[in-house]
Amino acid sequence: MNNTVHNRIFRIARREVFRIATRPLYLFCMIIAPLFCYLFFTTLMWNGLPTDMPAGVVDLDNTATTRSIIRNLDAFQQTKIIAHYPSFADARKAMQQGKIYAFYYIPKGTTEKALASRQPKVSFYSNYSYLVAGSLLYKDQRTMSELAGGAIGRATLYAKGATEDQAMAFLQPIVIDSHVLNNPWLNYSVYLSNTIIPGILMLLIFMTTVYTIGSEMKTNTQKEWMGMADNSITVALTGKLLPQTVVFFVMATFYNVYLYGFLHYPCNSGILPMLFAGLLLVLASQAFGVFLFGLFTTVRLALSTASLWGVISFSISGMSFPVMAMNPVLQALANLFPLRHYFLIYVDLALNGYPLIYAWHSVVALMLFMLLPFFILKRLRTVLLHYVYIP
């Protein structure tokens, strides 16, 4: 009996390989699109942290001190002063036109007030429509303001006879020694690519799995497919999805080797646990795709739901905004997305270097996704054997 089942699975798998090889859509979704996304997102952020972002200055004081502040601000890695504007209105207009991301405003009399210890005020404006650029330039401008204030205060203390140690102890009584964990380069490609790339692969698996089942109904070949499996829905799905599992796992292996072997992104646990996590993501995504088609039984609705679920995964996985800071309802709903659990495995293994056992809850969650098709197998079998496709 086992040989018979194995033969049926093999014949269905061979049939599926022929369908994949003769239909460009499969090749695009399974090979071309993932490879394009791998290269696109990693080369898009090839330099890591953005540098030399355009900023402007409004210097109404125009003294040696303020010019020194501007030169020092321009020396920051992320900031590049590209223009000096005569007024606040001109600088604001340039920022609204997208010519600059931020500008530094120094009012008239700043140096005189600083030397007289009258607390002059400088202003800096950042365009947070561009979150990354706005945040980085705001950080540079704020740092420069603090350094400028400290420099003036140090000069005043020196003039009053204070030593360097006394002046520094007064200006900075607590010295901060900061160390960035896991991504010390602040590389945005490390931050984003490790989740975006698996997320895109997951989305493509959702849609390919739904389409590959629905296409049987669309071409009215579902009974032929089920007949090759002796009307066993388990054998039919196993044989049909097995070639896709192999291809998608190869693609998952490729992005792991590409990210951690070629680009040398942090992978403190070694690549083998991440390959295992990639296999779990592939199987969980396929199982979820089967579940969606069995739940809705129509290609159009199942594909729409798969697309929606995949896109929302990027926001709710915790990659861009921490789940613990979300609404409690959203925190609970985050567990319904496979990418969330893959992200937790990535953080525990690749970034923190923990053994796989410490990510057991996420591993179990992905395995639970693999059980979803069992809830709709009977319904799916009935649909494939008796329902007629309606365009």
Task: Annotate the PLM regions.
Residues L25-C29, V190-N194, P198, V235, ...:
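Alpha-helical transmembrane segments of integral membrane proteins
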Residues M1-V190, V383, I390-P391:
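Extracytoplasmic/periplasmic domains immediately adjacent to an N-terminal transmembrane anchor
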Residues T65-I69, T209, T221, F291, ...:
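Hydrophobic alpha-helical segments typical of transmembrane helices
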